[in-house]
Design a protein with these regions (language model features):
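Positively charged, low-complexity intrinsically disordered regions
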Residues: 50-51, 77-80, 89, 107, ...
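Basic, amphipathic alpha-helical segments enriched in Lys/Arg and hydrophobic/aromatic residues
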Residues: 85, 94-150
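Surface-exposed, flexible loop/turn segments at secondary-structure boundaries
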Residues: 66, 91, 142
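Polybasic low-complexity intrinsically disordered regions
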Residues: 1-78, 84, 88, 135, ...
Length: 150
């Protein structure tokens, strides 16, 4: 399952990550690159409906605005959760470090250190998701053992 992302001009897949404030993985969904970000978020959040009952705030990129807010509100267990969209300032082009966005980018950087995740070697999206989970388990175990700086 590969697609073409016309915004970034790339073939392949998108990795949708749901992380906590420490950058540790809570959920992952891998989709074709042609799938819009908010549609990927809908499929990811559908799996998480009943797992995180204490969650009250979700920070998201501008790409996740729109239907996602209405969809979250329509779900009874998720009505207590507020979706905060981290917006880019008007008129600024190029790279800009956005508040809270760097949490996910840092996790992507951690995952990029694993050779198996540096390129899209996997045929099935489920295999990609599994390899991301394995890499995060390895990272968390090393962090618990104190062999890697946090």
């Amino acid at each position: 399952m590969h697609g073409y992302d016309t915004y970034k001009n790339v073939n392949g897949r998108k990795r949708h990550l749901f992380v906590d404030t420490l950058g540790l993985l809570l959920a992952v969904v891998v989709t074709a690159a042609s799938v819009q970000d908010r549609d990927g978020a809908l499929s990811m959040l559908a799996h998480l409906r009943h797992r995180f009952s204490r969650m009250r705030l979700i920070w998201a990129d501008q790409a996740y605005a729109g239907d996602l807010v209405a969809w979250l509100w329509s779900l009874r267990p998720w009505r207590k959760i507020r979706l905060a969209i981290v917006k880019r300032p008007e008129g600024i082009k190029g790279f800009l470090l956005l508040p809270k966005r760097w949490l996910v980018e840092r996790t992507f950087a951690w995952l990029g250190r694993y050779r198996r995740l540096s390129k899209d070697y996997e045929y099935l999206p489920r295999t990609s998701e599994t390899m991301i989970r394995v890499a995060m388990i390895h990272l968390m175990v090393r962090r618990l053992a104190g062999t890697v700086p946090s």
